[in-house]
Amino acid sequence: MGAYKYVAEMERRKQSDVLRFLLRVRCWEYRQLNVIHRASRPSRPDKARRLGYKAKQGYVIYRVRVRRGNRKRPAPKGATFGKPVNQGINQLKFQRSLRSTAEERVARRCGGLRILNSYWITKTVSTSTLKSSLSTPSTRLSVVMPVSTGSATPYTSAENLAVSHPLGKQNRGLGRGSKHTKSPNHAFWKRTNKLFLRRYR
């Protein structure tokens, strides 16, 4: 077996003494850093390479920390606009994953880069840390590579989430096979053309 096989096997056993110690040290280290910061190299090189990262010019790695748990609805200065004060505030469930949120924040920070993919590193009680790999579309090297083909113009953060990287496809239900035959177009039309008179926010 090659070295990456051993690394991948070690990452699978998260209850082992080695990995429990490593995750504890990583949690402490990442808490001292900014919420979004650039990493010099991937924490899991085998996983990063599987997801399209290459250790060459034009590819960068960013580490992101995202808060876990429910999404709290903002009610500035307690302005509830005639609705009950405590209803529909705390127990809202965000429809997208933490990974999607992390990728969106990195895309907003690095407007000239394109998201390739991301993977989980560690989590604490209140936060989850993920790593995103990005490529530079304007670099000749990465434009030539088939992994990151496309025009050399930078994306907006919304386009970055909608392009054909795996999470963007998953969120929009794109793909081939029997799971992807039922189009969400009618449901989208119905949702956007219906009048909602909600008692609670």
UniProtKB/Swiss-Prot annotation:
Transmembrane segments: none annotated. The keyword Iron-sulfur does not apply. It comes from the Eukaryota. This is Large ribosomal subunit protein eL15. Pfam families: Ribosomal_L15e. PANTHER family: LARGE RIBOSOMAL SUBUNIT PROTEIN EL15, RIBOSOMAL PROTEIN L15. The lineage of its organism: Eukaryota, Viridiplantae, Streptophyta, Embryophyta, Tracheophyta. Keywords: Ribonucleoprotein, Ribosomal protein. It comes from Quercus suber. Coiled coil: none annotated. Signal peptide: none annotated. InterPro entries: Rbsml_eL15_core_dom_sf (IPR024794), Ribosomal_eL15 (IPR000439), Ribosomal_eL15_CS (IPR020925), Ribosomal_uL23/eL15/eS24_sf (IPR012678). One of its GO terms (cellular component) is cytosolic large ribosomal subunit. Belongs to the eukaryotic ribosomal protein eL15 family. GO terms for biological process: cytoplasmic translation. GO terms for molecular function: mRNA binding; structural constituent of ribosome.
